[in-house]
Amino acid sequence: MASAQLIEQLKNVEATFQELTVRLADPDVATDPAELQRIAKARSSLEATVQTFHEWQKLTRELKQTEELLREVASDDPELEAMARAELEQLRVRQEQLEEKLTLLLLPRDPNDEKNIMLEIRAGTGGEEAALWAADLARMYTRYAEKMGWSVRLASLSEGEMGGYKEAILEIRGDQVYSKLKFEAGVHRVQRVPVTEAQGRVHTSTATVAVMPEVDEVEVVIDPKDIEIKTARSGGAGGQNVNKVETAVDLLHKPTGIRVFCTEERSQLQNRQRAMQILRAKLYEMKLQEQQASISSARRMQVGTGSRSEKIRTYNYKDNRVTDHRLNQNFLLEPILEGELDELIQACIGLYQKELLAELS
């Protein structure tokens, strides 16, 4: 049975939901698009909790009615009693499931969960093979995003000398992108025979993934004096003019040493805007990392640290196996590389929620 504290929390959520519903119908709110969007978003974030609470209330009433029926027929009708007991058991199981779901729905929410992201993939140890592996990861995340109905765009790219990517930044936009992909941050290790390996020996290479929530100018303020910008001729889109006009932008943030090189847009202005967007995301991620480091010193969670240096996964081609070290669980390699990440990601979310519940209790 749900605790009095849980029920009180749910009643407060329900009251807030009803208040937001009333405000949405206010003519004054309807004339303010920004306020209308804010209220609609806040209401939407509570909808699943309220609907589940209503389902729990209905089921609890049914359970009480069944208990009363059981008391009435206990000695008169053995067959009806057996049916009532079976139904009562089913209702109790369902009630327990709903209470567990409601507890999870009331967990503190990450304010970044609904945001779009910049997903950065950098080749790590392993030379040219690491660059090829980084490109494979970029393809994997692109496939996953497409399956989720999200849009993917290459925001920045530095190619390897023999192919692959030294560094790639994907801009991924859609519903709840950060909430799904934030657990992908860390070191991804691959064990396979490189195409350049004549002896058939297995090599180990790595690539590092960073997941940066998209932020606006209000959330991260950058002093123009801290920025140094150089331009260069682009090797990207642009047809015959590609090497005649300096459209590429090389941006340096002097206080942190962060450098962003953008060539993917057609004009210098667009590349400059894109570089600033990436810089803001990188600075915000640094702030998140600092916050997470202070939290991690107080608790040690298997998932959710988001550290670039944490080895989270090994992809073993010989055994057709992917091992997630946080979950201590194996998955088939080929579906994962084709973007079938949902089972793995949901498992990470489940573990994170379980650890958060344990910490709160």
Swiss-Prot record:
Q: Which residues form the signal peptide?
A: none
Where, per UniProt, does this protein localize? Cytoplasm
Post-translational modifications reported in the UniProt record: Methylated by PrmC. Methylation increases the termination efficiency of RF1.
Task: List N5-methylglutamine occurrences by residue.
Answer: 240
Q: What HAMAP family does the database record attribute to this sequence? A: Rel_fac_1
Instruction: Return the similarity comment.
Output: Belongs to the prokaryotic/mitochondrial release factor family.
What name does UniProt use for this protein?
A: Peptide chain release factor 1
Q: Which organism is it from?
A: Synechococcus sp. (strain JA-3-3Ab)
| Gene name linked to the record | prfA
